[in-house]
Design a protein with these regions (language model features):
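Glycan-processing catalytic domains of CAZymes
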Residues: 36, 40-394
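Bacterial signal peptide processing site
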Residues: 7-9
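Post-signal peptide N-terminal segment of mature Sec-exported envelope proteins
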Residues: 14-41
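Sec-dependent bacterial lipoprotein signal peptides
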Residues: 1-4
Length: 394
């Protein structure tokens, strides 16, 4: 996830997680676009899934405030907006001195409001953020063994290699993989979470392209170990899935859209197909949009301006989500990853009655990028070429 030591915004110096490979290789402009998929049938699974309903737009929330915990009022706002959440990596760090303790406290508070709230613990698979008692060793000026061997080294200096502010894990070290998976399992149990969100699934492969196959295999093995460590009823939400092997291991997948190139019209159509595949396997998808990645938003500074822009663009992105939404597809929306980046904004559209889709989406003109879909209580139209969407609530 593209998201300082104590303040979450500093971590935006780290690169974003890759989206699924199919998105990174969008269909050429001249190619015949893929038609939107039919709604997938629900299949039985062994793990617990978050509550899902078509009554209103299914919403996923993910946020953090590195300085503090939520106020009671903020807790109520978030709980009213979604029953599927994740606490971001620095949430509550300054207050609790350990993000694992902060996550435990917040999850307890959410579940007092609604025991069915589905809450995830955050852990990074590529960067050694020293925000919890389990990882604080990586923040030391000198990292002692065996933890030093868990980090990549700069070939010129021999010092731990950095990407932005973060030291980088060495996924090819089997002892690291064992430690990482065990730490994830311990974190899920200690916090009372319903699963884990795993960020940065690339394994720092950009540092050793010639070993991509080995890195991919090691990453997949580590996720398999993590799945075993958290237990069969807990979910493994992966930020991207770069291989069929990862798809088989993960229970849920995020489409992060870390930059504008991931939300082209071709990419969105391909993601609709991916969402169908995910649902057909009984898995979960999170379609996340940060409007701050749009070129126009780059000129906006204040939270008020960004909120206004997010409201202006909501009809398009929500329509695009609904065209491809399947059972257990969730929408995340805002302009960043902190608590102040949209998690507390109340969008009226999210509370309007939606109802289940009546049928698959249609494409009136095969040469155009306009798609429509009927829900029980809403009619949806999106023009991907124009970047415009309409939702008529019945």
């Amino acid at each position: 996830m593209g998201i300082s030591a104590c303040d979450q915004r500093v971590a935006e110096s780290t690169p974003p997680a890759p989206a699924p490979k199919a998105v990174e290789q969008p269909v050429a402009e001249s190619a015949s676009p893929t038609p939107p998929p039919a709604q997938a049938a629900e299949v039985a699974v062994t793990y617990r899934r978050p509550p899902f309903s078509w009554d209103t737009v299914p919403i996923y929330q993910m946020f953090g405030d590195g300085k503090r915990l939520l106020t009671d009022a903020e807790l109520s706002i978030v709980a009213a907006s979604s029953d599927f959440i994740c606490l971001e990596k620095t949430h509550g760090l300054k207050k609790m001195r350990c993000t694992k303790l902060a996550a435990k406290r917040e999850i307890e508070r959410f579940k007092k409001i609604d025991p069915k709230m589905f809450c995830l613990f955050y852990f990074n698979s590529a960067y050694a953020f020293s925000f919890s008692k389990d990882t604080q060793v990586f923040g030391a000026e000198v990292v002692e063994e065996p933890f030093r061997s868990f980090l990549l080294s700069d070939p010129k200096t021999g010092e731990p290699k950095l990407r932005g502010i973060a030291r980088m894990y060495d996924v090819l070290n089997p002892k690291f993989r064992t430690w990482w998976a065990a730490t994830v399992g311990k974190g899920v149990r200690a916090t009372g979470a319903d699963g884990v969100f795993v960020d940065q699934m690339h394994g720092n492969v950009f540092s050793r392209r010639k070993q991509q196959k080995e890195v991919d295999a090691a990453q997949a093995e580590m996720m398999r170990m993590a799945k075993k460590a958290i237990g069969p009823e807990k979910i493994l939400l992966l930020n991207g899935a770069d291989s069929p092997e990862l798809f088989e291991i993960g229970d849920a997948f995020m489409f992060e859209h870390p930059s504008a190139r991931f939300i082209t019209k071709e990419a969105i159509v391909k993601e609709w197909d991916d969402m169908k595949k995910i649902a057909a396997a009984g898995k979960i998808s999170v379609w996340r949009i940060g409007v701050n990645k749009e070129p126009k938003a780059a000129k906006l500074v204040s939270e008020a301006d960004l909120e206004k822009f997010s409201r202006e663009r909501l009809s398009y992105y929500l329509a695009a989500f609904l065209i491809g939404a399947q059972p257990y597809s969730y929408f995340q929306y805002g302009w960043g990853w902190t608590l102040q980046d949209g998690a507390l904004v109340e969008y009226p559209e999210f509370s309007k009655p939606l109802g289940a889709p009546k049928a698959e989406a249609t494409r009136p003109d095969p040469a155009a990028w306009i798609f429509t879909r009927e829900f029980e209580k809403a009619s949806v139209r999106v023009d991907l070429a124009a970047g415009q969407g309409e939702i008529h609530w019945h």
